[in-house]
Amino acid sequence: MLLLLLLLLVAAAQAVALAPRRFTPDWQSLDSRPLPSWFDEAKFGVFVHWGVFSVPAWGSEWFWWHWQGDRMPAYQRFMTENYPPGFSYADFAPQFTARFFHPDQWAELFQAAGAKYVVLTTKHHEGFTNWPSPVSWNWNSKDVGPHRDLVGELGAAVRKRNIRYGLYHSLLEWFHPLYLLDKKNGFKTQHFVRAKTMPELYDLVNSYKPDLIWSDGEWECPDTYWNSTSFLAWLYNDSPVKDEVIVNDRWGQNCSCHHGGYYNCQDKYKPQSLPDHKWEMCTSMDRASWGYRKDMTMSTIAKENEIIEELVQTVSLGGNYLLNIGPTKDGLIVPIFQERLLAVGKWLQINGEAIYASKPWRVQSEKNKTVVWYTTKNATVYATFLYWPENGIVNLKSPKTTSATKITMLGLEGDLSWTQDPLEGVLISLPQLPPTVLPVEFAWTLKLTKVN
């Protein structure tokens, strides 16, 4: 009898040990959830801002707010000069046709760019949903405009190519009557949250099973108004994506850079030293807007080398790099955006070994005759230098060589010659080749094995 009791106790203890951990709806518990490994390994993603704002395609994706919220004169003038009296923002929606949107073409482009995840705007602050939301009647892509489920179509296309799928979702809607009512009540009521925000979040998760939820539009209210912790506890405990899903930190005005999964902190966040928490830099190829603009100029488009430098720096500091593009109202990705994405992909084909699944090294960067950023993987150190030194020699002060040290350049055959200088560090002789023969045009990566 005693033996049976002991066996039952052991079995019960094992059952408890094997039971999945449950998270409670508070930040102390939710913040303790380990980040699924796929996100840190991915490193590079593509952000897509697409919605009714792609129709006027002027100024920025905040067009509606600047026109009728803070009533900026330039936006007032644009409407007066280009549209008849009485034209409303809702009148733009039928022109959001997505007629040339071929999700497989988009997915092929993102794959060629080397992206490991893609994040699509399901709903921006204008409130228009890119899926048939049951609580957004006649203000969604199925009822008006494209008459298509844009979220579902792109998700199917990217997942066929083993690209992770993330969904951007704005918590607030600028002009929704229930949101304005809650604002009038000092956010002491939650009419909008209960009728709109939370039903849509649960619907997105259950319908599309996203790998990532990119929350935004949180800044006017605390997380208690949004019921964020209750949603995240369900997401981590009971949702169909509970084991793999990732979230960011925009769940209330008190959360950015403090609570959530990984940290965005603010748009285009770029720390100067290694943070102690996983983070992501989200930035836009058009430096002046996230949505497509018909009036953009080359001066606002990030150059290829600028994008790659940001990617290298971000990864060296332990972050992910999420690069945004804005398609047209018709569903086209304009050639300049395609060119930039393909340039990143070409660079990653050669240097991706130093990026994907890498970790920050003990020293993240140094600057001598060029700027160098370090990463490491499987005891190998990678040093990416941004500018080719005039004397053809890269000196690295941080790595400590051994008699077995070997140094190569990614994309080239053969070892590079090097010497150890007591003051200058490792002096590496670069190959004497014309630029057309080098593996890439900028940001070359040295691979160092058997170094300390």
Swiss-Prot record:
The record marks 282 as: May be important for catalysis. Its EC number is 3.2.1.51. InterPro entries: FUC_metazoa-typ (IPR016286), Fucosidase_C (IPR031919), Glyco_hydro_29 (IPR000933), Glyco_hydro_29_CS (IPR018526), Glyco_hydro_b (IPR013780), Glycoside_hydrolase_SF (IPR017853). One of its GO terms (biological process) is fucose metabolic process. Residues 1-17 form the signal peptide. SUPFAM superfamilies: (Trans)glycosidases (SSF51445). It catalyses: an alpha-L-fucoside + H2O = L-fucose + an alcohol; a neolactoside IV(2)-alpha-Fuc-nLc4Cer(d18:1(4E)) + H2O = a neolactoside nLc4Cer(d18:1(4E)) + L-fucose; a neolactoside IV(2)-alpha-Fuc-nLc4Cer(d18:0) + H2O = a neolactoside nLc4Cer(d18:0) + L-fucose. It is an enzyme of class 3 (hydrolase). Alpha-L-fucosidase is responsible for hydrolyzing the alpha-1,6-linked fucose joined to the reducing-end N-acetylglucosamine of the carbohydrate moieties of glycoproteins. This is Tissue alpha-L-fucosidase. It comes from Mus musculus. The lineage of its organism: Eukaryota, Metazoa, Chordata, Craniata, Vertebrata. The gene is Fuca1.
